[in-house]
Amino acid sequence: MPRSQINGNFIDKTFSIVANILLRIIPTTSGEKEAFTYYRDGMSAQSEGNYAEALQNYYEATRLEIDPYDRSYILYNIGLIHTSNGEHTKALEYYFRALERNPFLPQAFNNMAVICHYRGEQAIRQGDSEIAEAWSDQAAEYWKQAISLTPGNYIEAHNWLKITGRFE
């Protein structure tokens, strides 16, 4: 049974109903409809913390989805799951892939910056200031890109850039 038929959450049910209506009235191919169904089920599983199921749905959605813009969001969500699982290298890979298809995803730049900042902090704890500086510089570049796409957002990152002298 598709996940959309078993959701107990009111918001998920509402989203599923609206999505099903849109799929019926918007002219799309059967492959696009199937890709969206997997994507929707992936989002539902992800919101419930069922990451293995979400990944399975997202991988199937990427196999079917041909639109680069839509693929970017699928890849971004895969990156989110890998971030949540502490698989930062994989997460960075999926954020990069998402940005290749859609360079206007500030949230992907932000998440990449957070990972780089975290790695910089780890390097500081390990006493490797050179590596820490490199990771922090990379975090700064990603945060600058996120901020340039959505000025007014990422206030904490903006402040960190100023405090560390990386804001230009």
Swiss-Prot record:
What are its GO cellular component terms? chloroplast thylakoid membrane
Report the family membership.
Belongs to the Ycf3 family.
Which Gene3D superfamilies does the protein's record reference?
Answer: Tetratricopeptide repeat domain
In its UniProt entry, the species of origin is given as Piper cenocladum (Ant piper)
Cellular compartments annotated: Plastid, Chloroplast thylakoid membrane
One Pfam annotation reads TPR_1
What phylogenetic lineage does the species belong to? Eukaryota, Viridiplantae, Streptophyta, Embryophyta, Tracheophyta
Keywords of this entry = Chloroplast, Membrane, Photosynthesis, Plastid, Repeat, Thylakoid, TPR repeat
Primary localization class, coarse: plastid
**Repeat as a keyword?**
yes
UniProt-listed InterPro entries: PSI_Ycf3_assembly, TPR-like_helical_dom_sf, TPR_rpt, Ycf3/AcsC/BcsC/TPR_MFPF
What superkingdom does the record give?
Eukaryota
What residue spans do the TPR repeats cover? Answer: 35-68, 72-105, 120-153
BP terms from Gene Ontology: photosynthesis
Q: Which PROSITE patterns match?
A: TPR (PS50005), TPR_REGION (PS50293)
Write down what this protein is called. Photosystem I assembly protein Ycf3
Q: How does it sit in the membrane?
A: Peripheral membrane protein
Q: What does this protein do?
A: Essential for the assembly of the photosystem I (PSI) complex. May act as a chaperone-like factor to guide the assembly of the PSI subunits.
